[in-house]
Structure formats: C-alpha cells, structure tokens
Amino acid sequence: LSGCQRKIEPITKSGFMLNTFVTVTIYDKDDPEILDDCLDLCRSYENMLSRTLKESEVYQINNRPANQQTVTVSDDVRNLISMSQHYSELSDGGFDITIEPLSSLWNFTSQKPVVPPDHEIQKAAAKVDYRNLKLEGNTLTFLSPDTAIDFGAVAKGYIADRLKEYLVKEGVKSAVINLGGNVLCVGEKPDGEPFKIGLQKPFADRNETIETFQIKDLSVVSSGVYE
C-alpha cells in the first residue's frame, strides 16, 4: 500500500576493544556504514587513550623521557584532563587520574592477578597526586617525574558521548551504545517506548539481572569485579 512505511529492523555491530565487547545498535536507520564508522571511531579513541597500547597518545605521555616535563596534548586529552581535574578538586582527590602507578602495579587485566605487597602499594600510592598536573591550553606540565595518567575511570563515558554525537550528526534518533559497563541510549525506541536496560546480578549467569531500568536518552553505568 502506498501509504504504508516499511518497518526498519534494528541493525547491530560488535567488536572487542577497550578491554570489553563494544556493541552499537541502531533502531531507526538501515545503514551499516554508520555502524562501521561508529566502531572505527571507538577504535581510534582506544588508540588515543589506552595506557597500555604502545602507539597511544597516553602511553607516549606516560613514557616520556625522564627529563621531559612538558608535553603537547590533543584536544580530546586536554578535555579529559580538564574535566578530571575538576572532579579531583570537587572530591578533594578522591577521584584522581594520576592513579596510573597503582593501576600498573595491580595489573587488573592480568590473566593471573596477584595482590601486590603492601610496601609496593604504599610506594605507588605516594606517586598519586592530581596536583602534579598543570594544564595550560594544550600544554601539559608534570610537576613530578613519577606522575602518569590513567583515564580508565572516564574514558568509556567520554567515548560513548562522542559516539552519540556522531550518530546524532548522521540523523540517528534511536540507538543503544554498549561499552561494557557503560550503556548510553540515544533517544527512545521508534515506537516511543523507553529502552529497557538490565543490571546484571554479580557472579550469576549473564542473563540474570537484579534490576531493570526503563530509560530514554540517558546512560546507565555499572562497575564490578565479577567480569
């Protein structure tokens, strides 16, 4: 019938990056190229913000020559540092991206994680202090040679926001971006209903949830040690 519109089926694409499975699902556009570009964009941010990939900007910053106190950073890294410093001030250091020495020591992504000795933990903790970073424009100065940065607490949220910006620019009004424990919903379902996001029950089967949220154009973020 001429007055009928074909129902668009959701399209989805997944990939392993950011140490998790990344999945993007679009509900109102049948354009796989948008999905491809979205995951490529996510990969480009991983290659910029990872502290372990040797080609990343953050890795290069952290492994700067011992006598180099000042580095020039990209706009994205500048934005993340500025935002992180703001929350460090608000939390009086409770949030701190200079936690990298502790992150490396604990090595949470190891196949066989081991609790470090207490004296090593104390030694690494002494290197953590957001006040040792001085940001002026795109120039970052380290006030201590032991200072290194880890965006692990903010990178996924920042990346999810950038992916949403890209999808909206491409005319997408209904989508779900899943970056592991970070789920961002773009708009609502095509029928106007909210998205249903389940919160996994720790240490249970993957299909077992303890709570379900119904949200529109919002994010749900969880964190745990069970994955």
Which role does the model predict for each range below?
Residues 2-227:
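Mature catalytic core of soluble alpha/beta enzymes
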